[in-house]
Amino acid sequence: MVMGRIHSIESMGLVDGPGIRTVVFFQGCGLRCSYCHNPDTWNMAGGKELTAEELLKKLLRFKPYFDRSGGGVTFSGGEVLLQPEFLIDILKLCKEQGIHTAIDTAGYGYGNYEEILKHTDLVLLDIKHVDDDGYKCITGKGKRGFDDFLKAVENIGVKVWIRHVIVPTLTDSKENIRKLANIIKNIRNVEKVELLPYHTLGINKYEKLNLDYKLRDIEAMDKEKRKKLEKYLKELLE
C-alpha cells in the first residue's frame, strides 16, 4: 500500500483554483527557492503518513462546499510530483467521487506525468524563471526538469493557470516578462495568468528552522510596478 506524506490540510481555500477548495500540502520538495515561504515542507521525512483512502475520508467532509461553489481539492506542497504514485491514487479516488482536482506544482519531480495529468482537471503551474541560469539562481536546479513536465502538460492538454512570482532584481524586468510571454504562448489551454508579488512574510520560519534567508536584503515587490508588468504581459499575450 502506497503511503503519502502530508504536511497539512487547509480548508476553505479561495485562491488555489475555482470555488471553495481544500488544499492538501504534500511534504517534501527538491527545489530550494530563494523566496519559499514554506521551508518546513522541504524535508521528505517530515509530515504525517496517510493512505489515499484515509485522505479521501477527510476530503469528503467538505464535498458539500465543493458542490455548491464549483470547488474541489488542490494538491500543493512542497512538491506534489515527488510522491507520484500516491498522487495518482488520491486523484483517482477524488475523480470517482466527482471531486474537481487541481495540482499546484513547479513541475519538478518524477514519475509518469501524463498518467497524473489524466486525472487532473487543472494545473496551477508555477514558472520560477524563464531561462536556465535564472532557474538555477532561484531554485538551485536547472530548468530542464520543468521543461519535461511542460511537455506532458502539452501532450495531455489539461487546463492551466500560470503563476510567476515577481521578485525585485530577479524577475521584475521587461525582458523577463517578454520571455515569460513567449513560454505562455506555447502552452495550450491557459485560462489564467497571475503575477504574484514577492513578499517577506516567510522570513520568521527561516529563523525558527535556523535557515539562511537568501533574499533578506530585498524588499517586498512594489505593488504599482507589479501592476504595470501585469498590464505589459497582458498586452504581449493579446
UniProtKB/Swiss-Prot annotation:
GO terms for cellular component: cytoplasm. The keyword Transmembrane does not apply. Binds 1 [4Fe-4S] cluster. The cluster is coordinated with 3 cysteines and an exchangeable S-adenosyl-L-methionine. GO terms for molecular function: 4 iron, 4 sulfur cluster binding; [formate-C-acetyltransferase]-activating enzyme activity; metal ion binding. Its main location: cytoplasm. Its EC number is 1.97.1.4. S-adenosyl-L-methionine binds at Y35, C36, H37, G78, D126, I127, K128, H199. Its cofactor is [4Fe-4S] cluster. It is found in: Cytoplasm. It is an enzyme of class 1 (oxidoreductase). Disulfide bonds: none annotated. It holds the Pfam family Radical_SAM. Keywords: 4Fe-4S, Cytoplasm, Iron, Iron-sulfur, Metal-binding, Oxidoreductase, S-adenosyl-L-methionine. CDD domains: Radical_SAM. Residues 15-236 form the Radical SAM core domain. It catalyses: glycyl-[formate C-acetyltransferase] + reduced [flavodoxin] + S-adenosyl-L-methionine = glycin-2-yl radical-[formate C-acetyltransferase] + semiquinone [flavodoxin] + 5'-deoxyadenosine + L-methionine + H(+). [4Fe-4S] cluster binds at C29, C33, C36. Activation of pyruvate formate-lyase under anaerobic conditions by generation of an organic free radical, using S-adenosylmethionine and reduced flavodoxin as cosubstrates to produce 5'-deoxy-adenosine. Belongs to the organic radical-activating enzymes family. This is Pyruvate formate-lyase-activating enzyme. The gene is act.
